[in-house]
Amino acid sequence: MKVLIVESEFLHQDTWVGNAVERLADALSQQNVTVIKSTSFDDGFAILSSNEAIDCLMFSYQMEHPDEHQNVRQLIGKLHERQQNVPVFLLGDREKALAAMDRDLLELVDEFAWILEDTADFIAGRAVAAMTRYRQQLLPPLFSALMKYSDIHEYSWAAPGHQGGVGFTKTPAGRFYHDYYGENLFRTDMGIERTSLGSLLDHTGAFGESEKYAARVFGADRSWSVVVGTSGSNRTIMQACMTDNDVVVVDRNCHKSIEQGLMLTGAKPVYMVPSRNRYGIIGPIYPQEMQPETLQKKISESPLTKDKAGQKPSYCVVTNCTYDGVCYNAKEAQDLLEKTSDRLHFDEAWYGYARFNPIYADHYAMRGEPGDHNGPTVFATHSTHKLLNALSQASYIHVREGRGAINFSRFNQAYMMHATTSPLYAICASNDVAVSMMDGNSGLSLTQEVIDEAVDFRQAMARLYKEFTADGSWFFKPWNKEVVTDPQTGKTYDFADAPTKLLTTVQDCWVMHPGESWHGFKDIPDNWSMLDPIKVSILAPGMGEDGELEETGVPAALVTAWLGRHGIVPTRTTDFQIMFLFSMGVTRGKWGTLVNTLCSFKRHYDANTPLAQVMPELVEQYPDTYANMGIHDLGDTMFAWLKENNPGARLNEAYSGLPVAEVTPREAYNAIVDNNVELVSIENLPGRIAANSVIPYPPGIPMLLSGENFGDKNSPQVSYLRSLQSWDHHFPGFEHETEGTEIIDGIYHVMCVKA
């Protein structure tokens, strides 16, 4: 246990009260309580701001000075941002303290200890009792139960075979593995025979209580804890919602797990096509694509569904937000899509934090309270491990029940099909803890901190861009509004100079309005989408607002390679866009290093520093290509290639339309199982049917889905693969990753259904 004692700067240490505080600190130490002492408000505030976990906050204040009242309020406020139920003690003279405090302040203090009347041992005992009660309610249901069960130190005769880690200690490699991860991981790795903990698959005991807790915090009627990632969550929902007789509506900007769900179920898809801007940034599906008339027309015209014209789709899925951080007004989208289907699925794998900050109001699935829901059944899937705080593979399915609801027993059959009978309890517990971290005040505090850091970074980049361009030079600029308006005053500001509080709390600063050039989404409806502040893209120079390449530019691939050499890994790179995810683990020092590294790139780029000095590994590996080049020379060569070939335009064309679907994804997959497939080189792809999806990274979205036809030799799909092949040949070391292709002797091949 740990106590923070904050003493007033107005209290002299050598007074009788000061000596009494010293005796209390000694008494606490004798009860194995760690005592941290602070002798000023600033020091105490700094300790709490550093996320120091404490079990009790004590003030040695007489409350006679006006500043003491304000200090106490601020310190308790800071404490409660992340540690809401920590007991607060006021140590003081009874008559003076009570007489000086108002009602609001009295309500913030849990206990008053009269330091001159009660003994130090008595006050210490009261504090230990309060801290014990606090700790008993601190941990969420499953994690608490696991810790208690681990303390039993049982002799187990069941799986897993390592028996609490003992098995690993019997060889040197196993011992090293055991010591590296620590004993608690292995002690809590238990089989499903521990009935006192309940069951993940039956949702009983501590597992069931954990899911009820998650449902309350995330605003669902029911939540399902998943340990096979959101890929498993998505497949589970699809397996529960559809069969091979169903028509379903799918966002073309979908994760590959959605296609896998189509393979498993055999359902017949029609697709909603999202928008893209000049940079290849993924925008929203426009409302006209979601209109019931539009979707029924697609059903009647698609080769896969035309025999089911007029049939009501059993399911509809939308990716929210897009990978680039474009968030739908989910309320508006739901109002449209519920006219088509009674089951809506928002794949919010990268967006599980939205409920906890008002800046995202109306732009996520689990809006408001479950009891107020009246409409279709709504699913949301969250990767708690992505931008919350959980171990990899941790995920949640959240459900608001309405029309088309699937009862527990039926849904659980699909859940068990995709779960495991041997879950790693550490993943389950991390899901539980991720929920508890978002409960109460801490959810707002944690999300606000991330938004604050992201906005600070954006403004720092905007100021540098402004300064460099004023000097006739170049720099990277953040992809966001260049001018914002305070809706209360009507005053406008350059983004770089806008009040931070305006940018971090007012949603309109991030809403995409029609006619704004910065976002580049033509004809976007008002109040349809907003940019997520924490998904930060920076733009390298080289592309004009009309989408045409300028005379000179800096290819983003070269910048990303520079960053990688300095230990910085962006989440996504296109021709002129580099994207960074701000999360709860990002610090000011981390993004400060990023800014410095970008400035370093500019300095060396402008100086045309030889590649042998700044990227020696590249020169060593490919001396024939790069030996005599400077970094600016390479950038110019890359830019000239981009200007001539413009692969981004080919990719935008590929994503703006739909290839002909010859067979369903399931039928294409069956061809793989039957070995009725062959690898086909790029020049022979025209007219062939893809057996697997082709997914360029970035953006990680299917350009072609299983069962679709490549089209003729000039189709955007074939043209784009041809341009990638050319890029890889010209710039070894900068190859693109394209899932679903195989490169043989420098030639792209794709697995196709045999003709």
UniProtKB/Swiss-Prot annotation:
UniProt main location, coarse: cytoplasm
Stated regulation of activity: Homodimers are probably inactive, their assembly into a homodecamer at low pH requires neutralization of negatively charged residues. This uses cytoplasmic protons, contributing pH regulation and stabilizes the homodecamer.
Biological process, per Gene Ontology: arginine catabolic process; intracellular pH elevation
UniProt cross-references to Gene3D superfamilies, sorted A to Z: 3.40.50.2300, Aspartate Aminotransferase, domain 1 (3.90.1150.10), Orn/Lys/Arg decarboxylase, C-terminal domain (3.90.100.10), Type I PLP-dependent aspartate aminotransferase-like (Major domain) (3.40.640.10)
Domain of life: Bacteria
Cellular location(s): Cytoplasm
Biological role stated in the UniProt entry: Component of the acid-resistance (AR) system allowing enteric pathogens to survive the acidic environment in the stomach. ADC can be found in two forms: biodegradative (this enzyme) and biosynthetic (speA). The biodegradative form plays a role in regulating pH by consuming proteins. Converts arginine imported by AdiC to agmatine which is then exported by AdiC.
Protein name in the entry: Biodegradative arginine decarboxylase
GO molecular function terms noted in the UniProt entry: arginine decarboxylase activity; pyridoxal phosphate binding
Gene deletion effect: Loss of formation of agmatine, loss of arginine-dependent acid resistance.
